[in-house]
């Protein structure tokens, strides 16, 4: 006897069917049941009424939709993971960009400091040369 009663929400549902167009509408007793654990209980396909061709067809469609749903959920999970990876890469690239900008500023500051120090050194060399000349003049006049 086949029951069409709803399964309680706290019990898992196991479903067996074949998507092949078989001439025999009754599923074999030894077939492996399909399980849709990723579906919420209210979305689980209800067992069909085997006496109704329309019920069997709706059941098959529901199972196909459940399989498609599972594939879409897997793809969403993969895409979310890829999104996280890309965000991490973007964060790293932005950090490297900031680091590069800081290095450019530091290089510019050091270049300016180097120019200033070279100018000061040149002025000191010039002043030292003037002092030597003055010292030599004093030594020569004494």
Curated annotation (Swiss-Prot):
InterPro entries: Map3k7cl. The gene is MAP3K7CL. This is MAP3K7 C-terminal-like protein. Detected in lung and peripheral blood leukocytes. Expressed predominantly in peripheral blood leukocytes and ubiquitously in adult and fetal tissues. Also expressed strongly in breast carcinoma GI-101, colon adenocarcinoma GI-112, and prostatic adenocarcinoma PC3. One of its GO terms (cellular component) is nucleus. Contains a C-terminal domain similar to that of the C-terminal section of MAP3K7. It comes from Homo sapiens (Human).
């Amino acid at each position: 006897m086949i029951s069409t009663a709803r399964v309680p929400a706290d019990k898992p549902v196991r479903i067996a069917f074949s998507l092949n167009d078989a001439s025999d509408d009754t599923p074999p007793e030894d077939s492996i049941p399909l399980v849709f654990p990723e579906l919420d209980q209210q979305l689980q396909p209800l067992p069909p009424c085997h006496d109704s061709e329309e019920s069997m067809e709706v059941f098959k469609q529901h199972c196909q939709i459940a399989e498609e749903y599972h594939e879409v959920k897997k793809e969403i999970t993969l895409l979310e993971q890829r999104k996280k990876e890309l965000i991490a890469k973007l964060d790293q690239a932005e950090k490297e960009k900031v680091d590069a900008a800081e290095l450019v500023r530091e290089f510019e500051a050091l270049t300016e400091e180097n120019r200033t120090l070279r100018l000061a050194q040149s002025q000191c060399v010039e002043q030292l040369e003037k002092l030597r000349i003055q010292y030599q003049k004093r030594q020569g006049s004494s």
